[in-house]
């Protein structure tokens, strides 16, 4: 088992409880979805909602988008994510 209180995590008891509860509540499909990232330029809320609800993406990567578009897309992705989405630029 991973020691979540040790380096590099340094989580407290409340954070560890959140991790354990979240993982326990996830379906196998949701866990597999966390392995996948999307390089997306779409900014449609309907499209992004569908990505999160159908594929349970673990992250999103950006490539040359205007800052306001990135912020808007992040807001939408996080809104529909069960687990916070990892964002990379």
Short names for language-model regions:
Residues 1-89:
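N-terminal beta-rich core of secreted/periplasmic extracellular enzymes
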């Amino acid at each position: 088992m991973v020691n979540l209180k040790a380096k590099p995590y340094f989580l407290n008891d409340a954070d560890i409880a959140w991790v354990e509860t979240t993982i326990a509540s996830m379906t196998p499909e949701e866990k597999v979805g966390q392995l996948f990232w999307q390089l997306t330029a779409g900014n449609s809320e309907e499209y992004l909602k569908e990505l999160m609800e159908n594929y349970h993406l673990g992250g999103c990567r950006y490539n040359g988008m205007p800052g306001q578009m990135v912020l808007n897309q992040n807001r939408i992705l996080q809104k529909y994510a069960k687990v916070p989405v990892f964002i990379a630029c």
